[in-house]
């Protein structure tokens, strides 16, 4: 996004999840977005919309909020935490007359099948599911064989699948 000249970049996503016995009030994608904007010197103040479940309805509601807050000055782009949320965001933008990608760009995460059927079609990060599964199985086997809790931070390959909701420079 930044290499395409986008400087005002917002975030739209859900909140919280439970893993094991631990509840996490903030989704890791939002944490990554905050870190990323800080490192790049981007101001995301007032451009983060994160609440609710990872659903189309949540996306529509948060998309409507973003339009109401920025109708006359839409951010250059939004990163959306999941394709299901992005479907609702695109619906809200279309209903409000916000044209994607002319008025703002949208990039999502997961590259689910629905991404190719939205209007406009959704640019989305594809996460290598095979690599993710292999890594999880390897980590599980290590934890079982060592009989102790191991903590790993692992980066999984992603590929940006460019469709109509974002036109790179």
Regions found by a protein language model. Give the residues of each.
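Bacterial carbohydrate/catabolite-sensing allosteric modules
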Residues: 1-169
């Amino acid at each position: 996004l930044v290499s395409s000249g986008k400087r005002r970049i917002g975030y739209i996503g859900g909140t919280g999840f439970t893993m094991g016995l631990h509840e996490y009030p903030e989704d890791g994608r939002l944490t990554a977005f905050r870190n990323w904007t800080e490192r790049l010197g981007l101001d995301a103040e007032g451009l983060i919309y994160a609440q609710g479940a990872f659903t189309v309805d949540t996306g529509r509601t948060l998309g409507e909020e973003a339009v109401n807050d920025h109708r006359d000055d839409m951010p250059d782009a939004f990163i959306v935490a999941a394709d299901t949320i992005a479907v609702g965001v695109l619906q809200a933008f279309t209903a409000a007359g916000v044209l994607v990608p002319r008025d703002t760009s949208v990039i999502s995460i997961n590259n689910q099948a629905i991404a190719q059927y939205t209007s406009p079609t959704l640019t989305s990060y594809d996460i290598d599911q095979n690599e993710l599964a292999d890594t999880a199985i390897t980590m599980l086997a290590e934890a079982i064989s060592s009989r102790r809790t191991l903590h790993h931070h692992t980066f999984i390959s992603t590929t940006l699948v460019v469709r109509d909701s974002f036109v790179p420079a």
